[in-house]
Amino acid sequence: MILPQRVPGLLRRAVRIGLPISIANFVVAASQMIELLIVGRHLGTDAFGGVSLAATFSLVLILAFYSLQIAVQAVVSRRHGARDYAAAGAALNTALAIGTCCGAAIFLLFQFLGPQVFVAEREEISALAFQYFRWRLPSIPMLVLILSIVGFFNGVGRPDVTLRVYAPVLVAHLAMVWAFTGGLGAERSLGVRGAGLASTLSTAMGLGLFVWNLARPAMRERYGLLRFRTGVTRAAARPLVAIGLPIFFQQILGNFSIYLFQVIAAQVPDQAATLVATNIALLFINISTLPGLGFGTAAAT
């Protein structure tokens, strides 16, 4: 039972944790919309449609590993609350090892798949989607690791770290999308490949900043972070798998329906314009859920 006198304190803690998470998620969703608008302005409606299709497919893959973020956050918050800092660090070290293996498997799998992954009535849309996806693919393994790290910082009550990393990375990402898709002149445009390359480079920047925060001497000493020979254990893996695996399949089933919605939109006669409209609608729906997601994360922590 929560005593009435504890409510203000709990509310302050929920706001302190939940508000940065909500803001960070909103900034990410807004940047996705701006990226698509830049692509559409510089490269046309077909490019917008192709990038929309590939970006949604990428999002399905990435959100499946949101399960790892939730699992890390759940384990770390409990271990941190019990002041078992070594176990909290072991949870992240083990999650990073799991994420590295899963990310490498995804990268290798999709090296052997062609444009047939992106089903559209017009081959031009499928080809543009595949071009974008191939240049964005290296970012997906890195994003799996980033999700684990975000879960760790949420679990120790430091979501502000995520916000401080996301802000400069997303600005750099949009600047690169603008530059690589024709902002510096049509003759220097890389087309949709430039948008995919911008995602990969900005993700590498973000991962580097997160690792820099983890590698600080005080963090490594307290939590034993980034010690993979001794910090990766079966004991740490068991709760991560027990929590994360059901959520993984839940995310796959739930979010694959979003991709199917995009595939259906890609079959109509004016498919490029339809993909534009459906993607914008999906982004607005996503943005509307972000406050609940942020404060739900705070409540779980």
Q: How should each PLM-predicted stretch be described?
A:
Residues 19, 31, 35, 68, ...:
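Residue-level signal for transmembrane alpha-helical positions in Major Facilitator Superfamily
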Residues 50-107, 146-157, 161-162, 277-301:
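Small-residue-rich hydrophobic transmembrane alpha-helices
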